[in-house]
């Protein structure tokens, strides 16, 4: 059962759930908290790689990722990031989120943006118990027109679901947690699997 607005506010008030900066009441709906777009992005560079062998030797996968992913792009305030049709880009939420070990979060895109072709997450919308950091957004433009995305715009909504008990292996205590304390648009770390 997901938390309702009253429960979200209670969890925020007593510090079990932390969202920084804390969202005002107007951004907390019946079962969700609206999140905004941050100013950090990462895209695929122009490259000549025919493919990335995801099950190949780790050093080759790592080198391929290094060749195709851009450095982090920090957008100045007021500027737009343009996502063209058929393009994938990574970005982050403006808000940082800290979940306790007995709560899982879910990220959903906004219907109004989806109706223009914008996917906010390609597949990864679960936020693990014990997570701490900003949420990476996996943007894909499936529409026909370029989309101008501006830092600070409402980009998605988080919902929260209590677990049956505390997780034995929350994200913040896992040795293999590849994105622990993530603050920027971190590229894939599939080579760390």
Curated annotation (Swiss-Prot):
Q: Name the GO terms of the biological process aspect.
A: dUMP biosynthetic process; dUTP biosynthetic process; nucleobase-containing small molecule interconversion
Q: Identify the stretch(es) annotated as Disordered.
A: 169-193
The terms under GO molecular function for this entry are: dCTP deaminase activity; nucleotide binding
Gene3D superfamilies (alphabetical)? 2.70.40.10
Task: Name the residues annotated as catalytic in the UniProt entry.
Answer: 138
- EC numbers for this chain: 3.5.4.13
Keyword Hydrolase on entry? yes
Taxonomically, which superkingdom?
A: Bacteria
Respond yes or no to whether keyword Metal-binding is given for this record: no
Reactions catalysed, semicolon-separated, are: dCTP + H2O + H(+) = dUTP + NH4(+)
Which PANTHER family does the UniProt entry name for this protein?
DCTP DEAMINASE
| Similarity comment text for this entry | Belongs to the dCTP deaminase family.
Function according to Swiss-Prot or TrEMBL: Catalyzes the deamination of dCTP to dUTP.
- Subunit structure and binding partners: Homotrimer.
Q: Can you say what this protein is called?
A: dCTP deaminase
Q: What is the lineage of its organism?
A: Bacteria, Pseudomonadati, Pseudomonadota, Gammaproteobacteria, Enterobacterales
Question: Quick one: which gene encodes this?
Answer: dcd
């Amino acid at each position: 059962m997901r938390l309702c607005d009253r429960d979200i506010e209670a969890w925020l008030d007593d510090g079990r759930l932390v969202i920084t900066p804390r969202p005002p009441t107007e951004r907390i709906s019946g079962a969700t908290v609206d999140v905004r777009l941050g100013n950090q992005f990462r895209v695929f560079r122009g490259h000549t790689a025919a493919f990335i062998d995801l099950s190949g030797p780790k050093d080759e996968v790592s080198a391929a990722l290094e060749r195709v992913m851009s450095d982090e792009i920090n957008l100045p305030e007021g500027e737009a990031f343009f996502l063209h049709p058929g393009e994938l880009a990574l970005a982050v939420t403006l808000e940082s989120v800290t979940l306790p070990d007995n709560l899982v979060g879910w990220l959903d895109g906004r219907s109004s943006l989806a109706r223009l072709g914008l996917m906010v997450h390609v597949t990864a919308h679960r936020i693990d118990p014990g997570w701490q950091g900003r949420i990476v957004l996996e943007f894909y433009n499936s529409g026909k027109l370029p989309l101008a995305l501006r830092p600070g715009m409402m980009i998605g909504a988080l919902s929260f679901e209590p677990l049956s008990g505390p997780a034995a292996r929350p994200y913040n205590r896992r040795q293999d947690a590849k994105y622990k304390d993530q603050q920027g648009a971190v590229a894939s770390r599939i080579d760390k699997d």
